[in-house]
């Protein structure tokens, strides 16, 4: 299993319940694709350096997880289809991390 980090920039117009729903959807996808969630870090509302979709603020969420490489493709496919996600980036943190086997 590899270790990944995905940083999401969510719309500031999403309610708290909708943000929680979006994050729980993505964590569900990670677990469904045989991944292991390590951390969900809500960075909160922050000012942006430049306007994104004519807005100057965004809500950041950082996901750290382990899983096989195809998991990232499925997660990113779902992120692209989700309304309210402005931008995202996924980074591989480590190769072959010893993870829990279910």
Curated annotation (Swiss-Prot):
UniProt entry keywords in alphabetical sequence: Ribonucleoprotein, Ribosomal protein, RNA-binding, rRNA-binding
GO-annotated biological processes: translation
Alphabetized InterPro entries for the sequence: Ribosomal_bS6 (IPR000529), Ribosomal_bS6_sf (IPR035980), Ribosomal_S6_plastid/chlpt (IPR020814), Transl_elong_EF1B/ribsomal_bS6 (IPR014717)
Keyword RNA-binding: yes
GO terms, molecular function: small ribosomal subunit rRNA binding; structural constituent of ribosome
Pfam families: Ribosomal_S6 (PF01250)
Top-rank taxon, per record: Bacteria
This protein's record includes keyword RNA-binding: yes
Record SUPFAM superfamilies: Ribosomal protein S6 (SSF54995)
A GO CC annotation given for this chain: cytosolic small ribosomal subunit
Record function comment: Binds together with bS18 to 16S ribosomal RNA.
Family statement: Belongs to the bacterial ribosomal protein bS6 family.
HAMAP family on file: Ribosomal_bS6
Protein name: Small ribosomal subunit protein bS6
């Amino acid at each position: 299993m590899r270790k990944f980090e995905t940083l999401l920039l969510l719309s500031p117009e999403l309610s708290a319940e909708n943000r929680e729903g979006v994050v729980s959807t993505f964590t569900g996808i990670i677990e469904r694709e045989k991944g292991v969630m390590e951390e969900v870090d809500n960075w909160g509302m922050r000012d942006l350096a430049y306007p994104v979709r004519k807005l100057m603020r965004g809500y950041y969420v950082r996901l750290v997880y382990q899983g096989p490489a195809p998991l990232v493709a499925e997660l990113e496919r779902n992120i692209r289809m989700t309304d309210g996600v402005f931008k995202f980036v996924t980074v591989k943190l480590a190769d072959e991390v010893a993870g829990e086997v279910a």
